[in-house]
């Protein structure tokens, strides 16, 4: 009689960043739900167990659902550098689950956070969970969400920091060109975009530097 192998003693993921509480949401194309226990690799760290992980999913034009974002170690670790180094007026391209905007607003060097989101249903999902209402008043007052196009948006006052995450895949070979366009529109002096380490490595390989 065979017996299942015991599960390895895996660490449970604990992020040093703020993790909002999410409420279930079901819209025409977007939904928010939770996974009870998931084994997830990190962006910088080995696999860890995550309990009650929130996921934002989107149904594509063929009717197939895709996980667009989640509170997984991969997602958090791949964006936390941008949040930790944000300053001044921060423009966040892509609301997602509101995580990056919330953590940027908590940074003492940040004075204002403007979030640009194209899809009103994503805005509704984050609003239903009251993500920014979970922040201290001083941080909550810094956040403003506007519906707009990340490639076209020009802020009323120039940005100091640009945080961009509007893509489904982690890597895009031409993503830096898209981000340069956003920088030109916003006037941002510093930028962090999702997957930028992979783009840097890709450019280095193209030039024979790696």
What are these regions (language model features)?
Residues 1, 50, 63-69:
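Long, low-complexity, intrinsically disordered polar/charged segments
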Residues 52-62:
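Short polybasic amphipathic segments
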């Amino acid at each position: 009689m065979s017996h299942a192998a015991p599960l390895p003693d895996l660490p449970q993921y604990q992020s040093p960043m703020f993790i909002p509480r999410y409420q279930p949401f079901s819209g025409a194309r977007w939904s928010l739900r939770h996974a009870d226990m998931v084994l997830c690799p990190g962006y910088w760290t080995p696999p860890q167990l995550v309990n009650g992980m929130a996921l934002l999913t989107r149904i594509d034009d063929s009717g197939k659902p895709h996980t667009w974002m989640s509170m997984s170690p991969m997602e958090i670790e791949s964006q936390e550098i941008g949040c930790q180094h944000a300053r001044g007026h921060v423009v966040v391209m892509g609301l997602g689950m509101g995580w990056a905007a919330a953590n940027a607003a908590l940074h003492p060097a940040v004075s204002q956070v403007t979030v640009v989101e194209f899809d009103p249903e994503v805005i509704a999902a984050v609003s239903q969970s009251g993500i920014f209402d979970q922040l201290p008043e001083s941080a909550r007052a810094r956040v403003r969400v506007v519906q707009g196009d990340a490639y076209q948006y020009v802020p009323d006052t120039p940005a100091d920091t640009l945080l961009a995450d509007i893509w489904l895949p982690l890597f895009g070979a031409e993503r830096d060109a898209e981000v340069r366009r956003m920088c030109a529109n916003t006037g941002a002096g510093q930028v962090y975009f999702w997957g930028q380490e992979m783009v840097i490595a890709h450019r280095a390989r193209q030039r024979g530097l790696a």
